[in-house]
A protein has these predicted regions:
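Bacterial lipoprotein signal-peptidase II cleavage site
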Residues: 26-34
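Bacterial N-terminal signal peptides that target proteins for export
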Residues: 2-12
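C-terminal motif of bacterial Sec signal peptides marking the signal peptidase cleavage site
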Residues: 21-24
Length: 712
């Protein structure tokens, strides 16, 4: 049948909503006949959608009892990853990137009549970027690296500072970088980000944090001068600068270890020994105390002036440690004197109860010998740079003679435990130990003869025990070996196992004269060690090879401070940490000999590399460190909770972007200098894992890597 409309023949009757006349089959319909409606589909919804968001579309089906539709994108049922996808409910999700043509057609096709459909175009736009934080860290002079973290950044995004575009490097969807010039004295820097067209629009504005110190400098300093950096302490050093942070630490009061009471409390009696409490006190102090530099220097001193609870009563260890911590920022002579008078050292190396010898005999030489050989001078004469002095035949020159050892031993006689009130006992030796006060002298037991010491110095006869002690210590303190011998070891413990002779010489010069004519000023020495060009070389050179193997206790404290922890022991004890470090051949004040856990002169077999901490490293310890790392990241440490769950700080970063989480691990544990290939491998290893497992695996891979085990 044909349709006749206003005199025109249109063909088969398909017109809708009009009055029609139908001729044929012997019947006719007049102008007042009922209108016939044809099926139709109309699509309505947003005309634009941004990447990362969704748009909802509605299909209105007319003149069909079945109103169900199937959705298409660019004629593809359900869409695909190139043009975007759409659900049965009409929710359209654009692709991850803008397609070649950024407008697509969303179509609804009638289920009842597939030839009936409706479409609507939708333009795909770039997202609006969102800034979470912006940080500017110095490179040199007024040049800064600006790091902008946030979300929805796309390749081609543009950073603006103060309304002006700056050359921008796209790192990831959550990070952008730029090099900017910030004039001296600038306190505020407004930053926003504009993604490129289509749909370019400015983000929120934030004020960038302008730091005095870059992340690598701050993190490396904290690695050298504390028991491990955390994000908070890194930001603190960035804000204050290296020199000001050191000054702040010098003025931070010490955090003393609590004295262990007598009789022992039950918590100390688990192994019938006070070491449980003594070691717990040490772990808690070094992990949580604000006086991190003081405690780190005290730790270094404890590995030079060695005593051990293997032979000493552990009650005296807390007093001894507090002595080192209190004296850490004083003068090296003060350290020598207070160590010599401490009951812990007295008992350990037999100066305690060493009385004057009968005619023809000599008093105990133990302390006299070790004080010179291990603590202050060394066996052979040194140049100011720590290298050996040689005689005309090319042989080392001994620092002292056996006869001089005996003379010093005589100078150290007459000392015993103080009474409970700190006074001199009525009898010698005092059989009642006082572990918490300096030793006192019983003059009748002191050798009052004259003594000939180093460099021909003579202590006159008739002096008191204290006068002889001070005279003997001054004689050693003034010896030119002390500076290079002690300073090299401090450098080894804090910065690098292999300091250059020039580095040692620079610090020795400060030891000899702090600039004001004072010898042995520990604050000047410590500042010089940490601020030396060799100490800071790795701040700007990620390939710098100086540093040292992290000894077990430092490896553990660095991890715990880096990720955070909660002590869950009913008594607040930290002692369980000793059980783990002991498996790696180290625990607080438990060296097996006066030579420390490792001697400063240790050389890796088969090499000429001086690397003291490697004396603790072997196949078994390497495997045990891997096992301990697994326990740490999986929260299996007795008495502690270590949260690396999906809701932890690292977990939240991983949920937003695994890249950001790995970068944060790099900031905390690798000075913000994680090698690119390592970062890529870690991200590949965690791809596809759940959020919590991403955090744990990434953390494990970082802390067990050789790049982390050796602190550069």
């Amino acid at each position: 049948m044909n349709v006749r409309l206003r005199g025109l023949v249109l063909g088969p009757a398909l017109a809708l909503g009009v009055t029609i006349l139908i001729n044929g089959c012997g019947s006719s319909v007049g102008g007042n006949s009922t209108q016939q409606q044809q099926p139709s589909v109309t699509v309505s919804g947003a005309s634009q959608v941004r990447l990362g968001s969704t748009a909802s579309f509605t299909a209105t089906v007319s003149n069909l009892s079945n109103t169900a539709v199937n959705w298409q994108v660019n004629s593809i049922a359900g869409g695909n990853s190139t043009v975007g996808t759409i659900t049965a409910a009409g929710v359209y999700t654009p692709p991850s990137t803008i397609p070649a043509t950024n407008t697509v057609n969303v179509t609804a096709v009638s289920v009842a009549s597939p030839s009936v459909s409706g479409s609507a175009p939708v333009s795909i736009l770039n997202p609006i970027a969102s800034i979470a934080t912006a940080e500017a860290s110095p490179v040199s002079g007024t040049s800064y690296t600006l790091e902008v973290d946030g979300s929805s950044f796309v390749n081609g995004a543009q950073i603006q500072t103060g309304g002006a575009n700056v050359a921008t490097t796209f790192v990831s969807a959550t990070e952008l970088e730029a090099t900017v010039t910030i004039p001296s004295g600038t306190t505020a820097l407004s930053v926003n980000v504009t993604n490129p067209s289509p749909g370019g629009a400015a983000s929120n504005n934030v004020n960038a944090a302008i730091y005095l110190t870059a992340v690598p400098t701050a993190s490396r300093l904290l690695d050298q001068a504390t028991f491990g950096p955390s994000l908070a302490t890194i930001r603190q050093v960035q804000s204050t600068g290296v020199d000001a942070w050191i000054t702040q630490q010098f003025s931070t009061p010490d955090t003393p270890l609590a004295n262990i009471p007598t009789p022992l409390p039950a918590v100390c009696l688990a192994a019938n020994t006070p070491t449980n409490c003594e070691e717990s006190e040490w772990w808690q102090t070094v992990l949580t105390g604000p006086d991190q530099l003081r405690q780190r220097v005290a730790f270094a001193l404890s590995e030079i002036f060695v005593i051990s609870s293997d032979t000493d009563n552990a009650t005296t260890i807390t007093y001894y440690h507090n002595t080192l911590a209190q004296d850490a920022f004083t003068n090296f002579y003060t350290i020598m004197h207070d160590v010599s008078a401490s009951p812990g050292m007295g008992a350990y190396l037999n100066m305690l109860n060493s009385a004057k010898a009968p005619a023809g005999e000599i008093p105990n030489e133990n302390y006299a010998r070790e004080l010179m050989q291990l603590f202050t001078l060394g066996l052979d004469l040194l140049n100011d740079d720590g290298t050996l002095q040689l005689d005309g035949s090319g042989n080392p020159i001994p620092t002292y003679t056996q006869n001089q050892v005996q003379e010093f031993a005589a100078a150290y006689t007459g000392w015993t435990y103080a009474t409970a009130s700190g006074g001199v006992p009525s009898k010698y030796p005092n059989g009642t130990a006082n572990y918490l006060a300096p030793m006192v002298a019983v003059e009748s037991e002191h050798d009052t003869t004259s003594k000939t010491l180093l460099n021909g110095t003579v202590l006159p006869g008739g002096q008191t025990a204290e006068e002889d002690l001070q005279g003997a210590l001054t004689n050693i303190f003034d010896h030119p070996n002390v500076g290079p011998f002690v300073c090299k070891q401090l450098i080894q413990h804090l910065v690098t196992s292999t300091p250059s002779p020039a580095y040692v010489a620079r610090i020795s010069a400060v030891f000899a004269n702090n600039g004001n004519g004072v010898r042995g000023d520990m604050q000047a020495v410590i500042r010089a060690i940490l601020e030396d060009t060799e100490a800071r070389a790795g701040d700007t050179d990620p390939t710098y090879e100086g540093g040292h193997l992290r000894e077990p206790m430092l490896w553990m404290t660095n991890f715990l401070r880096g990720v955070g922890f909660t002590n869950t022991d009913a008594n607040g004890s930290y002692f369980s940490l000793s059980n783990y470090s002991n498996n790696l051949n180290e625990r607080p004040y438990r060296a097996g000999a006066v030579f420390n856990f490792f001697p400063p002169s240790y050389v890796i077999p088969g090499t000429t590399l001086n690397a003291p901490e490697f004396d603790l490293e072997n196949t078994a310890s390497a495997i045990l460190r891997l096992s301990l790392a697994d326990s740490l990241v999986n929260n299996k440490i007795t008495s502690f909770t270590i949260d690396l769950s999906a809701t932890s700080a690292l977990g939240q970063l991983a949920a937003a972007s695994p890249d950001q989480m790995v970068d944060m691990l790099g900031t905390i544990f690798m000075h913000g200098q994680m090698p690119t290939d390592m970062r890529t491998e870690i991200l590949s290893a965690i791809s596809g894992l759940g959020t919590a497992q991403q955090v744990r695996v990434a953390t494990f891979l970082v802390i067990t890597s050789s790049q982390y085990k050796v602190m550069h």
